[in-house]
């Protein structure tokens, strides 16, 4: 291991996690998480489809903050809302923080929160195809052919 790799581990940034139902989100939290989702899912991905799909009120919202700023976020659902199994969606990390491995932290925390809040181990996601290896590194396995969602290639993946 190089000195640089050791220093990265020593000075690893830690996120502060919050898990909240929709009703418990503050106005500022809601604004900030919707802004982050829009920056990534609409602007960065050039996707002119509505991000607000009516499911936010049914989700637990997992928020990762660094120095008071929301930099990681996902929605968590019990079984029967998005898929037959519990599910994770709208997985997003602020573009300015992607080199910090916050996406991996977010997925580990999301899986733990689903197990804690819903008592479920089987989790389904609708993953953007280009992130297949990322999700495989968290135990997810592809279970469908590629399909288009909002003109973006996706696959269904399950973690058991």
Place the predicted regions along the sequence by residue.
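Conserved acetyl-CoA-binding loop-helix of GNAT-fold acetyltransferases
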Residues: 93, 99-112
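Conserved catalytic-core motifs of GNAT/GCN5-like acyltransferases
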Residues: 124-126, 136, 141-156
């Amino acid at each position: 291991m190089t000195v640089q790799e050791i220093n990265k581990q020593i000075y690893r940034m830690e996120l502060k996690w919050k898990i909240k139902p929709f009703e418990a989100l503050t106005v500022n939290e809601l604004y900030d998480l919707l802004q982050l989702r829009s920056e990534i899912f609409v602007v960065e991905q050039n996707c002119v489809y509505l991000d607000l799909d009516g499911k936010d009120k049914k989700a637990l919202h997992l928020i990762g903050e660094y120095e008071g700023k929301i930099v990681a976020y996902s929605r968590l659902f019990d079984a029967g809302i998005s898929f037959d199994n519990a599910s994770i969606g709208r997985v997003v990390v602020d573009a300015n923080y992607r080199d910090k491995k916050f996406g991996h932290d977010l997925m580990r925390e999301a899986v733990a929160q689903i197990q804690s809040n819903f008592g479920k181990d089987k989790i389904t996601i609708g993953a953007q195809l280009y992130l297949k290896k990322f999700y495989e590194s968290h135990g997810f396995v592809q279970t469908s052919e590629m399909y288009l969602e909002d003109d973006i290639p996706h696959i269904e993946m399950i973690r058991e």
